[in-house]
Amino acid sequence: FSVFSNSYMAVIGAPLALKYARYSNDRAESFRIRTEILQDEKGGKTVRKYPLSKEAEAHVRHMAEAYEKLKDRYAGSRLDVNVCHLGEENGIPYAEFAFVAGRPLSELMDECLDRRDVEGFHKLFAEYLERVGYGEDVPVADFDLIFANILVDGDHWTLIDYEWTFDRPIETRALAFRAVYCYVLEDERRNALELDRILDRLGITENEARQYREQEMEFQKYVTGQKLSMGEIRNLLGGEVYKPT
């Protein structure tokens, strides 16, 4: 570090409670939030989500409502829903979640693919379908039930992020297709996945897969307010490396 930097910043005082912060500010005004991980003096951690605008306050409050509805839907299942409570700080509401132990399901799936354990991957996928599909006909569903939003700790699977919960039933196969679609897009190493086998398992035709992809594009427009997200901007710019002459 000393080789590349000729300056530094020293913070003097008690340890900061804030350990991590992420800004989701490439969204529509009504969905912009800040996510924080806080640690108390005893080492206990909590997660908080704050609105970044007055318009986003309703979105944050909706998270607590989503928790209650999803908790009821998955009562008796083998999928836990991370606890959420509403709080207020300087007149600004926030949603507070427990800090859950475990590893993202996506990491466990990656390990299967890295060691070419295809059957291990599909075993985890089958477990995902069984757990998230509980109460499929109930008129509430988390549209963003991707693998990275589930933490696995032994036999305990916990849904940790459910801000995109809607008051309508959504077919499990639609949620699963989106989870796989997002999973593959996030890392090119995952292109080795046998998508045809997954489509067959879900009973999804090529035409239906195309429709689901179009729905995903519409959802992203809904989230970003028709604006380009940072990920979309990066894709448009490309990754070319220019050598100076």
Predicted regions and their residues:
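Helical subdomain adjoining the active site within ATP-dependent kinase catalytic cores
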Residues: 168-245
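Structural preference for long, well-ordered alpha-helical segments in enzyme cores
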Residues: 63-70, 124-128, 132
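Hydrophobic residues embedded in beta-strands of well-ordered beta-sheets
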Residues: 45-46, 93-95, 156-157
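Short acidic-glycine loop/turn motifs at beta-strand connectors
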Residues: 41-42, 90, 153-156
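Catalytic activation segment of kinase domains across protein kinase-like and atypical kinase folds
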Residues: 137-191
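ATP-binding glycine-rich loop module of kinase domains
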Residues: 23-71
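Rossmann-like AdoMet/SAM-dependent catalytic core
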Residues: 1-36
